[in-house]
């Protein structure tokens, strides 16, 4: 879709609020935020997905009509459609829409339309987008700037994926997985890092992925700003020839916003930010990990650039509640091991599904709880990712004490030989560094888990598929423990 088409659709939306907007894949993390904003703006919203969730119930309560199946009947009275990137071209509703000449927009195209009259701030990168966007949202809200926000995860402070604000600020997570972020034209772009992921969409070329990020950055005008992590080599490779202002952040001594003296105690991260004028800021975070210090540094760089009061910014970060499924502490479990013996375990839930994300989570746990028995329940996500990063997965997954590995969550991808959980299990077991077992039936999780408990355990639920709902239901049901 070109700019002229977007302008036509923009006029169509603004002038015809009685028209019906239908979102295919409305339950996806990236789609729910758009649906919330459209409902708040007063549009008629319908949508379809395959599974019910708390957020889908919330959308229904706000007035959306949602179908828990895909059918051409769902778009009977639809004027145009927004599709998730997870929806295939042969989806029944997509095919029916094409026959009826109903306009179809990608998620990113819709965000660009919503953002077009605002000061757009886009948060991109392989890792850390959702947490960084959440931090920025909190800082702007706490500073009274009332932004509009669309995030890829639940922001705990507002208990939502999105917020409609009254100010000129529009903050959004920008998705690089299918290069759709190139539809966006923000004033400010943050790039947290660039690593090989989703490279099947880039002809299996990391170079092409980096070049796409460069194209995205070059969309910033002369009066815009790029805020980038100087610790990441791939980012440094593409910073040449940008006409806009560049602000760097990181642990690197040359960073404009530099992290200094990072320390960690349990769930608390503490560090200083050193600015170019040698001013020092004392930062306390309620979430641990150097990667989260980097996320905070990106938010700090933006806040300073926008003239937000330092004290308000520091207080906001100190009160930051985190993001759903990003190193989320769910509580303690007391699990009956039999023979009047119980194991008290910490339960942590994390969305990370890339080897780098897994590695950072493991490091964070080892720093704060070095003597704990670390048990990871892991569900690989996508055959393509498992195939492309196979060696890294094997090495990283061998770093936990106990690994319970579920079958790959395919996300509708076709099976790839050698990129399955059985192959991972066999190769990790060969290393002999940890106890690893393959979970072929979800009902085996608790029984297998009980055999590995030592009484000083951390249970880490890890993955981006449906592992969170599977593990939560089993653990809560079997232990009869309400997780906070």
Curated annotation (Swiss-Prot):
Cell wall biogenesis/degradation as UniProt keyword = yes
**Gene3D superfamilies from the xrefs?**
Mur ligase, C-terminal domain, Mur-like, catalytic domain, NAD(P)-binding Rossmann-like Domain
* Primary residence: cytoplasm
- Residues bound to ATP: 125-131
Q: Which GO terms describe its biological process?
A: cell division; cell wall organization; peptidoglycan biosynthetic process; regulation of cell shape
Name the chemical reaction catalysed here.
Answer: UDP-N-acetyl-alpha-D-muramate + L-alanine + ATP = UDP-N-acetyl-alpha-D-muramoyl-L-alanine + ADP + phosphate + H(+)
The entry sums up its family as follows: Belongs to the MurCDEF family.
Q: Briefly, what is this protein's role?
A: Cell wall formation.
| Protein name in UniProt | UDP-N-acetylmuramate--L-alanine ligase
Which organism encodes this protein?
A: Buchnera aphidicola subsp. Acyrthosiphon pisum (strain APS)
Gene that this polypeptide is encoded by: murC
């Amino acid at each position: 879709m070109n700019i002229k088409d977007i302008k036509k659709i923009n006029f169509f939306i603004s002038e015809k609020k009685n028209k019906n907007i239908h979102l295919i894949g409305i339950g996806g993390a990236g789609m729910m935020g758009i649906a919330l904003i459209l409902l708040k703006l007063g549009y008629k919203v319908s949508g379809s997905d395959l599974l019910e969730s708390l957020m889908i119930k919330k959308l229904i309560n706000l007035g959306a009509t949602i179908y828990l199946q895909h059918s051409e009947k769902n778009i009977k009275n639809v004027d145009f459609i927004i599709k998730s990137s997870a929806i295939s071209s042969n989806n029944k509703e997509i095919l029916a829409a094409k026959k009826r000449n109903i306009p179809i927009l990608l998620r990113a195209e819709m965000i660009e339309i919503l953002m077009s009259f605002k000061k757009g701030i886009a948060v991109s990168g392989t890792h850390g987008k959702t947490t960084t966007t959440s931090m920025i949202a909190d800082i702007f809200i706490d500073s009274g700037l009332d932004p509009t926000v669309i995030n890829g995860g639940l922001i705990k402070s507002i208990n939502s994926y999105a917020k409609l604000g009254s100010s000129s600020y529009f903050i959004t997570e920008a998705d690089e997985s299918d290069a759709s972020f190139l539809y966006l034209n923000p004033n400010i772009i943050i790039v947290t890092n660039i690593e090989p992921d989703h490279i099947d969409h880039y002809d299996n070329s990391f170079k092409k992925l980096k070049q796409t990020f460069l194209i995205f950055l070059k969309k910033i005008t002369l009066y815009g700003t790029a805020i980038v992590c100087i610790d990441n080599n791939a980012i440094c490779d593409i910073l040449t020839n940008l006409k806009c202002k560049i602000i760097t952040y990181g642990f690197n001594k040359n960073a404009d916003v530099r992290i200094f003296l990072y320390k960690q105690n349990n769930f608390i991260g503490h560090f200083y930010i050193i600015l170019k004028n040698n001013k020092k800021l004392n930062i306390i975070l309620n979430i641990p990990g150097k990667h989260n210090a980097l996320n905070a540094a990106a938010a700090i760089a933006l806040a300073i650039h926008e003239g937000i009061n330092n004290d308000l910014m520091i207080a906001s970060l100190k009160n930051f509640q985190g993001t759903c499924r990003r190193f989320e502490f769910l509580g303690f479990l007391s699990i009956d091991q039999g023979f009047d013996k119980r194991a008290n375990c910490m339960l942590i839930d994390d969305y990370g599904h890339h080897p780098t994300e897994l590695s950072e989570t493991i490091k964070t746990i080892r720093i704060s709880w070095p003597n704990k028995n670390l048990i990871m329940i892991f569900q690989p996500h996508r055959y393509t990712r498992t195939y492309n990063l196979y060696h890294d997965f094997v090495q990283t997954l061998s770093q936990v004490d106990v690994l319970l590995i579920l079958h790959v969550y395919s996300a509708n991808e076709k099976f790839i030989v050698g990129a399955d959980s059985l192959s991972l299990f066999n190769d990790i077991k060969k290393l002999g560094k940890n106890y690893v077992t393959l979970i072929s039936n979800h009902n085996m999780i608790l029984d297998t888990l009980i055999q590995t408990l030592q009484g000083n355990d951390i249970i880490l639920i890890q993955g981006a598929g449906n592992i969170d709902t599977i593990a939560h239901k089993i653990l809560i049901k079997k232990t009869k423990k309400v997780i906070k």
